[in-house]
Amino acid sequence: MSHQNQLIPQAYISNFHNRLTNEDDGIPIFTMAQQTRQHKRAKVVNYAEYDNDLFDEFNMNGSNFNNADTHYKDNAVSHENTPALTNGVTMDGSEYNVLENMNGADSIISNNKYDAGSNMVVESLSGLNSNNNASNGPSNKAQAQDIGNAVLPDLQDQHHNPFNILRYPKIRDTFINGKVVSPYRLNTDQETKANANSGEAIMIPITLDIEHMGHTIKDQFLWNYNDDSISPEEFASIYCKDLDMTSATLQTQIANIIKEQLKDLENIAATEIMSDLHVIINLTCNLQDRFFEDNFQWNLNDKSLTPERFATSIVQDLGLTREFIPLISQSLHETILKIKKDWVDGHLIQDHVPNDAAFGYLSGIRLDIDELGSNWCPRVEILTKEEIQKREIEKERNLRRLKRETDRLSRRGRRRLDDLETTMRM
């Protein structure tokens, strides 16, 4: 493996390599070796051999700032592609003239010097004015970089029209050929937005688990049922473009899954519970090797606290990463919909909430001498993948057991009511 002292790319762009002494044992600034894929040998990355196409942004309005390939050697300046070069001398403060071809005419940068800060001082420049427009007026003082930077986009002036940056060739090519797309909000008119936000938000959790051409797509997100600004087909099209998978079969499959889950849960999600209904929720979710678990009491009739606000508060209190916010809110929405479904089907019949509150109160102080209320606190554990799967299996097993007990109690209550009605008929 061979190493070679290199300058970082920013040094070449900023003319930094000319400000160093050209001694044989120059100052080592940057050393890098990159392994190649096909060979075990190392390949030294030579940043000096940059692509001239990177500077195509400077070719604006017929101007050509890079038609001359400039080489700096032995403290002298030479242009290979320019018609002529006069007075190319050392950089100790001497003057030199460079003949350039700008806007189809010959323009001369004359009487150029380097000041104490090693910046080129331009005393006379014909062909460009202070705004970098074609003119014959002189310029008092400018740096060499300012000539090129004048045509670069000014990000501070882009807030009026975000598409102004597309006037620059390199950015426009990246926009067209790359993954950069316009924001989704620009594709929706204001009238559609007003109609979409007119109704109350009914959030339905959507889960994708798809196998397609050797790829596994797993994703979870929330869908506002009252938002008509985008259809499942449009969402599937944008979703596949983001994944670089433009398969019509995959788009149709994603759209059908979304519509199927919306159809199954729309009635339950839109159901309003008029009276207070307190339930105990055991919430679990995992992000990589971190397993989150919490046990709390939730009122299904209370709309002041949404799952999104609850998830944000939990993440802030525990100092978790923001990736936990959609995971916790998604899991809480799914749990609430399961509980509402049991309530609609008549399986949720309870006169007392098993919240371990003192004296049988609806909420309040809990008497827990052994555990000191540790079961009612959020906690995050670092577990292996097998341990997380084991926890999820145990949770599903406990939920099935509780459902069987609830069904048995409900059947026993209906049987007693039927016996009472039969006795009254006799």
Swiss-Prot record:
Keywords: Cell cycle, Chromatin regulator, Nucleus, Phosphoprotein, Transcription, Transcription regulation. It is found in: Nucleus. The keyword Transmembrane does not apply. It holds the Pfam family SNF5. The modification Phosphoserine is found at S78. GO terms for biological process: chromatin remodeling; chromatin remodeling at centromere; chromosome segregation; double-strand break repair; G2/M transition of mitotic cell cycle; nucleosome disassembly; regulation of nuclear cell cycle DNA replication; regulation of transcription by RNA polymerase II. Belongs to the SNF5 family. Component of the chromatin structure-remodeling complex (RSC), which is involved in transcription regulation and nucleosome positioning. RSC is responsible for the transfer of a histone octamer from a nucleosome core particle to naked DNA. The reaction requires ATP and involves an activated RSC-nucleosome intermediate. Remodeling reaction also involves DNA translocation, DNA twist and conformational change. Interacts directly with STH1. Component of the two forms of the RSC complex composed of at least either RSC1 or RSC2, and ARP7, ARP9, LDB7, NPL6, RSC3, RSC30, RSC4, RSC58, RSC6, RSC8, RSC9, SFH1, STH1, HTL1 and probably RTT102. The complexes interact with histone and histone variant components of centromeric chromatin. Present with 3940 molecules/cell in log phase SD medium. This is Chromatin structure-remodeling complex subunit SFH1.
